[in-house]
């Protein structure tokens, strides 16, 4: 097959009528794979077929010709289409679903077909296509007036948000938080690779992000004069993004989005800022290997409903700075812990289905019979929830009790209307219960009694004709018939009308049987039509109370999270933190909530104090001693407190922080073309440019990605900037022991260390925070534990003793104060009329001369004078010739 000629062509008279129809539809949807319904299959053609064959592992065949070449074709069975759609959606591919809407029996030429829906990664609502544990978000971004506008829509729940951020780093952080399934951006907007290379990234025409168009669209949908009621009328960039997003959602869903009831201003100023590096380093819901194992979410998530699990994930990624809301959540957890009142509530909540997404499908008119059945069973549990909440003294729980109100009329309606175990789809009927509709019951009775009638007719005709081989039957092609064997067919009565000849029998029809056939077949089709009409009526009736049902579903999700946090706090021995508006972090016997769960040995808890007099701790100690764990547990305790949860400690008092920053670990950014050190410096720059005195900063091993003195200088300067200018609460872990002298020079800075001890030629990590700097790093002992060959360890020990014997500017813990070390002084120029030898000379380098060598050669001197970044190609070639001449 010639792959160069299989691109989708333009329809012309050389194509069959069916293919012309397909090509017209495909021309309208060039960016989607088109699933074209033909009988029991969805067929794909041309490039779509080739792409599907590769992505879905289906067979690539051919059908007919275009421009003299075979047309590539692939197909998937209609009944299994959802599985294939799910796979494409996960790969970030959009699909246009084309259905037959005409009647083949009455249509001349190709059956009429039209696009019934467009399935995109960010707009799917079908249960089979979604991960119930994660939000499935459509997000749009744009840039206006030097601010990034961001809007998100959860099609399943109808949650629609808008907000703005000031810079690219904040944009990356928000995309990391939202984890969109599909991301829309203007064609001309330049974004970092970390965003543009995401699966589901779509470029849209710039005109789709026009502010005036967006405002008209949104005010028309919400039925308002302007957007001031949502508090976002001044967010030009945000509204522009929201307009593009909403238009795209309407276009793909082919319906009004009635479940999108409001636009929420998701104001970053009310939340703790977490950048992308912090979310990654703290492993909130994804570990560094890319899975959920051993994450904070995995430890906390014992939610009983899918929507509760999704809300808990959102809380972890959006800690709050509103002390009123946090105190309300704490009080609710405290009330639920009283007499273990969370237990009966959790037992009841287990019976509640994913109401958010069921209601989303209800609003989109795509709800299936089992959705309605689960909705009925779920809202039937609301009275029990009301009973459990009655009498619990908590303002937040009382508010939720009002939201999760009873719906007795809907429970009664759905209980009467639906079969006990309805089928998956309405197509074949069997959904509406007997006794709900008299007309439907009558039509069903005709079909149900057909079997009895045929038995009686067969007995009657055998007795009347005396033909022993006579029998009455039915098939889909020829309908009802009387069948008589060949040997007796000639004795058939004259009123028998021949219908079909078989090899060994003849089939007949009689006027009486034809009358019954018309009535029975008509009754079946009329029953299906009646049932479909009743089902649609149910959908409309439920949509009349959609807003109240959405509020109740939201209340159930929040109640689920609160009862889960109560259960976790009880089982994991968490304490209630004291929150206040001032500055300071006090943690007594703090623990890492995740590490504690995976250790076989008891976790060693540690204290922490940061306040107005002690704002920074310089942490030293051996690798594997627990420095990173101590730092991370501090951040996680603060984060848990600021979602309103209890924390893993014996006591905690916290002044709310506005941001949490982490510079921990090492990794490169191949897609962005950044080295490990460049990533480290970029993250450090973000901290130094954006941290405030109310921020919590964790910095681990700053400067290790470059030479010793470059790294030491950078780490030193970072400590000074954080202490003197930003005054942020900081945990600064380092192996540069020279930095432990800084507390003598900088106010509010103290040394602490995690200790270890040597025992029988091995090392024992104590994991306990102690005041003061560490005495040694134990690097060789850790290397030995890691399995480094003994001869290498021995050689390293010799090198270490030689290096330690060499004089340096400072030994550990003798950092000069207050004047900083001149790590490298320039050579002074000779004064006029004074011998050069009398000028100030450059002192010996304080860094040990590890590998003494001869003076540099002329070639080396020449090479050092060349900056390759500033050379033109011609200059580079000339430099090469010069070097050749020198050598």
Curated annotation (Swiss-Prot):
Residues 828-853 are annotated as: Disordered. The keyword Acyltransferase does not apply. InterPro entries: DNA_mismatch_repair_MutS (IPR005748), DNA_mismatch_repair_MutS-lik_N (IPR007695), DNA_mismatch_repair_MutS/MSH (IPR017261), DNA_mismatch_repair_MutS_C (IPR000432), DNA_mismatch_repair_MutS_clamp (IPR007861), DNA_mismatch_repair_MutS_core (IPR007696), DNA_mismatch_repair_MutS_N (IPR016151), DNA_mismatch_repair_MutS_sf (IPR036187). The keyword DNA repair applies. Pfam families: MutS_I (PF01624), MutS_II (PF05188), MutS_III (PF05192), MutS_IV (PF05190), MutS_V (PF00488). It comes from the Bacteria. Belongs to the DNA mismatch repair MutS family. This is DNA mismatch repair protein MutS.
């Amino acid at each position: 097959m010639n792959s160069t000629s299989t691109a989708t062509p333009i329809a012309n008279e050389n194509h069959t009528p069916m293919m012309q129809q397909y090509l017209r539809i495909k021309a309208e949807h060039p960016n989607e794979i088109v699933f074209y319904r033909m009988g029991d299959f969805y067929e794909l053609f041309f490039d779509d077929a080739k792409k599907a064959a590769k992505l879905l592992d289906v067979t690539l065949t051919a059908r007919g010709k275009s421009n003299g070449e075979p047309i590539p074709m692939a197909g998937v069975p209609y009944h299994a289409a959802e599985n294939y759609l799910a796979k494409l959606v996960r790969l970030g591919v959009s699909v246009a679903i084309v259905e037959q809407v005409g009647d083949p029996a009455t249509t001349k030429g190709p059956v009429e077909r039209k696009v019934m829906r467009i399935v995109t990664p960010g707009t799917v609502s079908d249960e089979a296509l979604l991960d119930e544990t994660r939000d499935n978000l459509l997000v749009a971004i744009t840039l206006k007036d030097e601010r990034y506008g961001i809007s998100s829509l959860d099609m399943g729940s109808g949650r629609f948000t808008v907000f703005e951020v000031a810079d690219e780093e904040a944009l990356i952080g928000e995309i990391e938080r939202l984890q969109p399934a599909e991301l829309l951006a203007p064609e001309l907007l330049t974004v970092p690779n970390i965003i543009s290379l995401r699966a589901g990234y779509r470029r849209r025409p710039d005109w789709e992000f026009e502010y005036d168009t967006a405002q008209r669209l949104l005010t028309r949908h919400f039925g308002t004069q302007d957007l001031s009621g949502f508090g976002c009328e001044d967010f030009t960039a945000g509204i522009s993004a929201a307009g593009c997003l909403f238009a795209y959602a309407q276009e793909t869903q082919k319906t009004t989005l009635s479940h999108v009831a409001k636009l929420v201003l998701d104001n970053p100023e009310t939340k703790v800022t977490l950048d992308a590096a912090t979310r990654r380093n703290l492993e909130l819901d994804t570990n560094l290997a890319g899975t959920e194992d051993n994450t904070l979410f995995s430890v906390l998530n014992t939610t009983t409903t899918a929507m509760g699990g999704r809300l808990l994930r959102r809380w972890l990624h959006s800690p709050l700075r509103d002390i009123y809301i946090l105190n309300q959540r704490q009080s609710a957890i405290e009330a639920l812990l009283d007499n273990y009142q969370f237990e009966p509530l959790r037992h009841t909540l287990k019976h509640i289905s994913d109401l958010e997404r069921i209601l989303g499908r209800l609003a989109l008119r795509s709800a299936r019979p089992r959705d309605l059945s689960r909705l009925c069973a779920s809202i039937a549990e609301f009275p029990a929830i009301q009973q459990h909440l009655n009498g619990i003294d908590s303002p937040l729980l009382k508010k939720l009790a009002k939201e999760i109100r009873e719906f007795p009329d809907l429970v009664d309606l759905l209980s009467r209307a639906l079969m006990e175990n309805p089928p998956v789809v309405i197509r074949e009927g069997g959904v509406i219960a007997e006794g709900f509709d008299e007309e439907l019951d009558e039509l069903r009775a005709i079909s149900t009694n057909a079997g009895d009638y045929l038995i009686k007719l067969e007995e009657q005709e055998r007795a009347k004709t005396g033909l022993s081989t006579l029998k009455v039957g039915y098939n889909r092609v020829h309908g009802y018939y009387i069948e008589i064997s060949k040997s007796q067919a000639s004795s058939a009565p004259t009123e028998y009308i021949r219908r079909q000849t078989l090899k060994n029998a003849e089939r007949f029809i009689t006027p009486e049987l034809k009358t019954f056939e018309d009535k029975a077949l008509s009754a079946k089709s009329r029953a299906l039509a009646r049932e479909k009409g009743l089902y649609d009526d149910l959908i409309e009736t439920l949509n009349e109370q959609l807003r109240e049902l959405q509020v109740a579903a939201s209340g159930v999700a929040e109640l689920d999270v609160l009862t889960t946090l109560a259960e976790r706090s009880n089982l994991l021995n968490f304490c209630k933190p004291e929150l206040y508006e001032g500055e300071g972090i006090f943690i007594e016997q703090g623990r890492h909530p995740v590490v504690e769960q995976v250790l076989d040995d008891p976790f060693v808890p540690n204290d922490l104090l940061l306040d107005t007099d002690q704002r920074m701790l310089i942490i030293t100690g051996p690798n594997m001693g627990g420095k990173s764990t101590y730092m991370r547990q501090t951040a996680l305790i603060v984060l848990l407190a600021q979602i309103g949860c209890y924390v893993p400690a014996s006591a905690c008092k916290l002044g709310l922080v506005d941001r949490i920053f982490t510079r921990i670990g090492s990794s490169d950014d191949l897609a962005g073309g950044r080295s490990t050190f460049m990533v480290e410096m970029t993250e450090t720059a973000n901290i130094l440019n954006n941290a405030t005195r109310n921020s919590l900063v964790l910095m681990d091993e700053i400067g290790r990605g470059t030479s010793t003195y470059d790294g030491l200088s950078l780490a030193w300067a970072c400590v000074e900037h954080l202490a003197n200018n930003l005054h942020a609460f900081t945990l600064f872990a380092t192996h540069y022991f020279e930095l432990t002298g800084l507390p003598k020079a900088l106010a509010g800075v103290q040394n602490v260390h995690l200790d270890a001890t040597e025992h029988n030629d091995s090392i024992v990590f104590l994991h306990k925070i102690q005041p003061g700097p560490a005495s040694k790093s134990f690097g060789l002992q850790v290397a030995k534990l890691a399995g480094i060959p003994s001869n290498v360890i021995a050689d390293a020990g010799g090198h270490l003793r030689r290096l330690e014997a060499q004089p340096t500017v400072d030994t550990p813990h003798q950092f000069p104060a207050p004047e900083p070390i001149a790590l490298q002084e320039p050579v002074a120029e000779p004064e006029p009329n004074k011998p050069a030898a009398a000028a100030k000379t450059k002192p010996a380098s304080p860094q040990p001369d590890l590998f003494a060598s001869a003076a540099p050669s002329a070639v080396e001197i020449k090479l050092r004078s060349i900056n390759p970044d500033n050379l033109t190609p011609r200059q580079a070639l000339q430099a090469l010739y010069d070097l050749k001449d020198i050598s």
